UniProtKB/Swiss-Prot annotation:
UniProt site (Transition state stabilizer): H391
Coiled-coil region(s): none
Keyword Translocase part of the UniProt annotation: no
Phylogenetic placement of the source organism: Eukaryota, Metazoa, Chordata, Craniata, Vertebrata
CDD domains on file: HP_PGM_like
Protein name: 6-phosphofructo-2-kinase/fructose-2,6-bisphosphatase 4
GO molecular function (one): ATP binding
Active-site feature positions: D129, C159, H257, E326
Length: 469
């Protein structure tokens, strides 16, 4: 029996790792065996204009945000790359042999890219976005998954409510490259005919015929669900997420607390109260929210004094969430950046090298914060109009989710004090409106310096530190 390997603490993440010959030991990949962490192939199912691409994009964004490398493969885009100019619905007729040949070629090209992503590039989840309306096509994709050691999970979107279908058709017509510069009525007519091309051969997932498959069926954008054979943790998270999202029009308002006494001094963390300007901002925020005349607005804060003081000025009920508390800076709490550089120069440099994954000694990383904030995202997806009064790092994490920002970009998103961001979800993304409430505040944003080397001089480490008292 081999002797136990030596452990050493990773300086960036502060986790213990086995070492071999002075180097971190890597876990052997066992992709051929379907373990809990083997790749997952999500297969969309449904007629056109049923919200499949909306679901695909939203699911991809969520999984990437929680740290699961995910990519969407839209077969329609592969078709557009091959057939440069879309002419009419006749391309999709079941007796159009040339069309059938090209569509199959596109599906196989997309699956080839799925294999490359999951088996060679370190991807964990691939979302295969196409109609996949026949049992034969789904069997082909399932076999592809089995041959490559992937778990396959089907997501079917069914819409029978004519109002939902009509709304989806408008969204598709507005956003599809197939109908750019086409007359609106002509585009609608063509798209309706395209849907008819699929309807006669459409075979929905069946509780008896498909009882061995893992799937979720979503009826009328979340009115009801059928869930079958959820196989592992990642599939259960996918189901939970899909059962929380909705398409009701709403806005989410994000802002930080008013300027705090420690903000003025350039000190991070702590639990200080508001500065005089911070209290002034609270009054301006109350007036802004009143002027917006928002129906059934929910207000959430952290459990820290500065967010609660800010919310008190609104004179409305609010809910305190511990998970909305600011990132825990551990041993660096209430220190200035200059003091951190002076006392912990190695830590300061490591954080600049990888700000997302760096964990403060006895504290948290942005990566930890994202995991902590997942329940907030789930609840924001369930709710309608919400104002979240939070903190700089927390606001960055929430903003990165809604704007689909990469982990490397997340810790540098600008979230200034005394500014409200109004987020309005739209078809395949989020519209952002930034509203400054005309109360001056200190700048707390620090850009990544050019020199992130451990041996850098102090003046180069501190070059991007904002001015403070």
């Amino acid at each position: 029996m081999a002797s136990p390997r030596e452990l050493t603490q990773n300086p960036l993440k502060k986790i213990w790792m086995p070492y071999s010959n002075g180097r971190p030991a890597l876990h052997a990949s066992q992709r051929g065996v379907c373990m809990t962490n083997c790749p997952t192939l999500i297969v969309m199912v449904g007629l056109p204009a049923r919200g499949k691409t909306y679901i695909s994009k939203k699911l991809t964004r969520y999984l990437n945000w929680i740290g699961v490398p995910t990519r969407e493969f839209n077969v329609g885009q592969y078709r557009r790359d091959i057939v440069k100019t879309y002419k009419s619905f006749e391309f999709f007729l079941p007796d159009n042999e040339e069309g059938l040949k090209i569509r199959k070629q596109c599906a196989l090209a997309a699956l080839s890219d799925v294999r490359k992503f999951l088996s060679e590039e370190g991807g964990h989840v691939a979302v295969f976005d196409a109609t996949n309306t026949t049992r034969e096509r789904r069997a082909m994709i399932f076999n592809f998954g089995e041959q490559n050691g992937y778990k396959t999970f089907f997501v079917e979107s069914i819409c029978v409510d004519p109002e939902v279908v009509a709304a989806n058709i408008v969204q598709v017509k507005l956003g599809s490259p197939d109908y750019v510069n086409r007359d609106s009525d002509e585009a609608t007519e063509d798209f309706m005919r395209r849907i008819e091309c699929y309807e006669n051969s459409y075979e929905s997932l069946d509780e008896d015929l498909d009882r061995d498959l893992s799937y979720i069926k979503i009826m009328d954008v979340g009115q009801s669900y059928v869930v079958n054979r959820v196989a592992d943790h990642i599939q259960s998270r996918i189901v939970y997420y899909l059962m929380n999202i909705h398409v009701t029009p709403r806005s989410i308002y994000l802002c930080r607390h008013g300027e705090s006494e420690l903000n003025l001094k350039g000190r991070i963390g702590g639990d200080p109260g508001l500065s005089p300007r911070g209290r002034e901002f609270s009054k301006h925020l109350a007036q802004f929210i009143s002027d917006q005349n928002i129906k059934d607005l929910k207000v959430w804060t952290s459990q820290m004094k500065r967010t609660i003081q800010t919310a008190e000025a609104l004179s409305v009920p609010y809910e305190q969430w511990k998970v909305l508390n600011e990132i825990d800076a551990g041993v660096c709490e209430e220190m200035t950046y200059e003091e951190i550089q002076d006392h912990y120069p190695l830590e300061f440099a490591l954080r600049d090298q990888d700000k997302y994954r760096y964990r403060y000694p006895k504290g948290e990383s942005y990566e930890d914060l994202v995991q902590r904030l997942e329940p907030v995202i789930m609840e924001l997806e369930r709710q309608e109009n919400v104002l979240v009064i939070c903190h700089q790092a927390v606001m960055r994490c929430l903003l990165a989710y809604f704007l689909d920002k990469a982990a490397e970009e997340l810790p540098y998103l600008k979230c200034p004090l005394h500014t409200v961001l109004k987020l309005t979800p739209v078809a395949y993304g989020c519209k952002v409106e930034s509203i400054f409430l005309n109360v001056a505040a200190v700048n707390t944003h620090r850009d990544r310096p050019q020199n992130v080397d451990i041996s850098r001089p102090s003046e180069e480490a501190l070059v991007t530190v904002p001015a403070h008292q």
